[in-house]
Amino acid sequence: MFFIGIALLTTTAALCQNKKEMDEPVRHFCVNINAGLGANYNTWFLEVQGEYNPISFLGINVGMKFLNPCTQDESLHIVCPEGKYELDEYSTFMYHFILHPSIHLCAPSIKLDNVGDKLIFRMEYGILLPLNHFTKGHAYPQPDNGQLPDSYSPIDIKNIKSGTPFYHETSVSANLVSDRWKLTLGYTFSNLDIYGSARNAYLGNTHIEFEKKKRGDEVFIGIGYYL
C-alpha cells in the first residue's frame, strides 16, 4: 500500500510542478531537529537529521534518534521460584540510539502569500536500525516484610541477544517553509519494538516480560534550516 502511495505521489508531484516552481532554485541541503512523543509507548525522542534534496520533490535523509522513557522512576516486579525481585530503571533494556535512513517525496507546494511562504506535504519511508542490542541489568531481592538484610547482592539478568535487525517506519507531515526555515508537524507509523533486544531476558529460569505493543507510532514536531 505504501509503495502504491509513493508511485501516486511521485507521479502527481512530477506532473504538477508548474514552470515557475521548476525554475526556482532548489536548496539541496537541510538540517532538521525533530522531537516527539510515543503514541503507543510512554516515550519521548529527539532526532538530528541531515537532508539532501537532489530535486524539488525527492530527497534522502539520515538521522540519529535518541529515545528515552517519559518517566524514570518505574520498576518491574518479578516473581520467580527463587523469590521476589525488583528490576529498577528497566529502561536500560530498551533501545536508546537508533540510526534512521529514509527517503521522502513531496507534493507540489502551496503558496500561502506573496512573500514566499509555502506549505508542503511530505511522505517519508525509512528503516530504524537500533544500535544498542546488548543490554544488561540487575534485579534486587524484595523480601515480604519489606526489610532488606544489611548485606545482599543484586542478581544479574541473563539476556540472550534478540531483536529484529531493523524496523520499518512511514511518516506523513505538513511543512511550513519560510525562506530558509522550515517548521514541521507530523505522525509516524512504525513497527518499532522498543524492548526488542530484551525479549530473551531471564532471571534464573524465569522469562522477564517487558511491555510490548503492536506498534511504535509517534507524533512529532520539528524545525529545519536550509543551507
Give residue ranges: language-model regions.
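Flexible, solvent-exposed coil segments and beta strand-coil junctions
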Residues: 23-31, 76-85, 145-155, 200-204
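Residues that define the transmembrane beta-barrel architecture of outer-membrane proteins
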Residues: 27-31, 42-46, 56, 91-99, ...
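Gram-negative (and chloroplast) outer-membrane scaffold detector with strong preference
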Residues: 49-147
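Short glycine/proline- and aromatic-enriched beta-strand/turn motifs that initiate or cap beta-hairpins
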Residues: 16-67, 72-75, 106-108, 224-226
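Predominantly the C-terminal beta-signal and adjacent terminal strand-loop region
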Residues: 168-227
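Membrane-embedded beta-strand positions of outer-membrane beta-barrel proteins
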Residues: 31-37, 60-64, 101, 121-127, ...
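Extracellular loop and loop/strand-boundary signature of outer-membrane beta-barrel proteins
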Residues: 32-36, 47, 82-92, 154-160, ...
